[in-house]
């Protein structure tokens, strides 16, 4: 297979236009052979639908620099399981791109990964979308880092789920 040979030996030579033209089958071939070899320009050339064909295992192998090069529309296209391994590397702008499907699938362990600057980047709407059990993952420091508008966004169900220890 010519493409497999190219993916194994000459991946870095492909232009952004060539990357953007890859089919799902070609991306799967690349994923099996060279999961870490995308350049920043190549990652940004991937369409949101192309990104959805990549496995969470592949995405987890990407460096923080590669993850932070993803565009907001690429982040929004990811399935919750694809987004999860990237969460700790997302910039505030990328976090703002998380949609309701992604927010409602966050777990306590996902929340624990967030640094103060990331946590504060979540919009009030995103805070209101968090599952009640995800809030149980917050530590006292994260609670202190909440902005007033984020606290105001908490729903009744979210408040009811909180223990005295959380506050």
Language-model regions, residue ranges each:
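General marker for long, soluble alpha-helical cores
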Residues: 1-167
């Amino acid at each position: 297979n010519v493409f497999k040979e190219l993916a194994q030996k000459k991946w870095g030579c492909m232009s952004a236009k060539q990357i953007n033209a890859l089919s799902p089958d070609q991306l799967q071939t690349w994923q099996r052979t060279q999961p870490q070899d995308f350049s920043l320009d190549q990652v940004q050339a991937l369409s949101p639908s192309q990104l959805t064909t990549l496995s969470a295992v592949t995405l987890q192998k990407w460096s923080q620099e590669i993850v932070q090069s993803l565009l907001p529309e690429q982040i929004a296209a990811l399935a919750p399981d694809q987004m999860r391994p990237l969460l700790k590397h997302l910039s505030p702008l990328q976090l703002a791109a998380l949609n309701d499907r992604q927010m409602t699938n966050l777990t306590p362990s996902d929340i624990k990964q967030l640094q103060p600057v990331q946590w504060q980047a979540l919009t009030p709407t995103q805070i209101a979308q968090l599952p009640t059990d995800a809030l149980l993952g917050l530590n006292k420091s994260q609670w202190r880092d909440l902005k007033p508008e984020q606290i105001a966004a908490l729903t009744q169900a979210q408040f009811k789920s909180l223990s005295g220890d959380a506050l």
